[in-house]
């Protein structure tokens, strides 16, 4: 999933992972990648990207996203950190809010 997120962030300033949140590139100098767990609606962009690259149906692409989100939430709920290769990591704070830190 990280590969798809990175590909989309190369041409978009926001990528929403449905039911998880959005990765957003702030356009100030220096550019910064942030995460907003309030933007978790399905805008279809990630699903369509996976569909196109893998040659699968929209529903199968959506299932891939749902499985990824379930995996992330399970790890975070257990108090562990979820690493997003070449992006950073997600963790849950004491108030159950998902936080993102960029890999340095």
Tell me the role of every PLM-derived stretch.
Residues 1-104:
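Cytosolic/nucleoplasmic/matrix-facing N-terminal domains/tails
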């Amino acid at each position: 999933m990280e590969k798809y997120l990175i590909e989309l962030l190369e041409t978009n300033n926001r990528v929403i992972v449905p039911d998880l949140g959005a990765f957003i590139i702030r356009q100030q100098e220096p550019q910064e990648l942030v995460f907003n767990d309030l933007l978790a609606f399905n805008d279809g962009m990630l699903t369509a990207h996976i569909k196109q690259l893998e040659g699968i149906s929209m529903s199968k692409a959506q299932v891939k996203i749902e499985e990824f989100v379930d995996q992330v939430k399970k790890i975070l709920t257990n108090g562990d950190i979820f690493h997003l290769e070449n992006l950073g990591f997600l963790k849950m704070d004491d108030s159950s809010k998902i936080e993102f830190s960029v890999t340095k």
